[in-house]
A protein has these predicted regions:
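His/Asp/Glu-enriched, well-ordered alpha-helical/loop segment
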Residues: 244-291
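Hydrophobic faces of well-ordered beta-strands that scaffold small-molecule active sites
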Residues: 57-65, 87-89, 117-121, 154-157, ...
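Divalent-metal coordination cores built from histidine and acidic residues
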Residues: 76-184
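Active-site mouth loops of central-metabolism enzymes
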Residues: 59-71, 127-140, 206, 210
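Glycine-enriched alpha-helix->loop->beta-strand junction motifs that scaffold or abut catalytic
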Residues: 84-85, 151-152, 199-207, 221-228, ...
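N-terminal metal-binding scaffold of metallo-dependent hydrolase/deaminase domains
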Residues: 1-40
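Divalent metal-coordination and catalytic microenvironments
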Residues: 4, 24, 51, 62, ...
Length: 291
């Protein structure tokens, strides 16, 4: 690809240059690449990148396949087509119906796609005990299967935050296991602040995507959490620009859809590229948004 604008999120600048891709991987990125240096010239295809901007692969920091109403394969294809190359996935709804076997089903189908999935083991099934029907309660034994047999990366959102704060035995056992194994533990704690937030974080939770005000986002950020800005098909109440202006540039600020983007919107507007466009429209600098 010749003469493309290349978004460099490490140095926070747009550079003009060439990109050489071989066998589906970036072989070289430079201000100028001489075609004479390239082996197998007979296979070389040159694309004029003038007027185009090359971005790094986008990552959805937290999402759910099931909310899209698509199969794992179709979901992954939609993401790849829109520049999302990796996603942190919580198979909560599949586990809600079929237990850990539901998660395995989603994982197996996605293996045949180009998306890089980061699967997290769902700890809070049911999410609201006593108010919903499901396959049964997820216990430590289920989480161990998902992590140790299925190869999941961490513990998905601890969405029953009341049980976390109350240190309810079965959920505490799961979170303690995650801490002992050094696993990432995602959060889900709308409106949880002050001493309750301290207890929630001490349980091992390291992220949150459910804040409803900038002040809530800032408190979680200042207490060391990864704060995930959510964008998609929903109208979100907290301003991304105001939060970023107050928090500053940080690797502890992420962007996700949380699965809250319809298949129709993905087809018409995109996926993480749509989420990026939304926060840029709010006033966030494009390079900061991409990072």
């Amino acid at each position: 690809i010749k003469h493309a604008a290349i978004a460099d999120v490490l140095e926070n600048e747009i550079k003009t240059g060439d990109i050489y891709i071989k066998d589906g991987r970036f072989e070289k990125i430079a201000e100028h690449i001489d075609a004479g240096e390239i082996e197998e010239k007979e296979r070389l295809t040159v694309i004029n990148g003038e007027g185009l901007t090359a971005l790094p692969g986008l990552i959805d920091a937290h999402t759910h396949v099931e909310l899209s109403m698509l199969s794992s394969a179709s979901f992954a294809e939609a993401l790849i087509q829109n520049g999302t190359t990796a996603a942190v996935l919580d198979p909560h709804d599949a586990v809600n119906v079929l237990g850990h076997k539901g998660a395995k089903y989603l994982m197996e189908e996605m293996k045949e796609t180009e998306l890089t999935p980061v699967w997290m083991a769902s700890p809070c099934v049911p999410s609201a005990p006593g108010y919903e029907d499901c396959y049964g309660q997820v216990m430590l034994s289920d989480v161990k299967v998902m992590v140790e047999e299925y190869g999941m990366y961490g513990i998905a959102e601890a969405m029953d935050y009341n049980r976390v704060i109350a240190k309810e035995a079965s959920l505490k056992e799961i979170l303690d296991y995650g801490k002992e194994k050094g696993l990432k533990i995602d959060g889900h704690a709308p409106g949880v602040l002050g001493a309750d937030l301290d207890t929630y974080i001490a349980a091992g939770v390291s992220s949150d995507h459910e804040s409803v005000t900038v002040e809530e986002m800032l408190e979680k950020f200042r207490k060391g959490m990864y704060v995930i800005i959510r964008r998609g098909s929903l109208k979100e109440p907290a301003s991304a620009k105001e939060f970023l202006d107050k928090a500053g540039d940080s690797d502890h600020i992420l962007l996700s859809t949380d699965g809250c983007i319809t298949a129709k919107d993905m087809a018409e507007h995109g996926h993480m590229n749509y989420a990026l466009a939304q926060i840029v429209e709010e006033g966030v600098e494009p390079l900061q948004a991409i990072k």
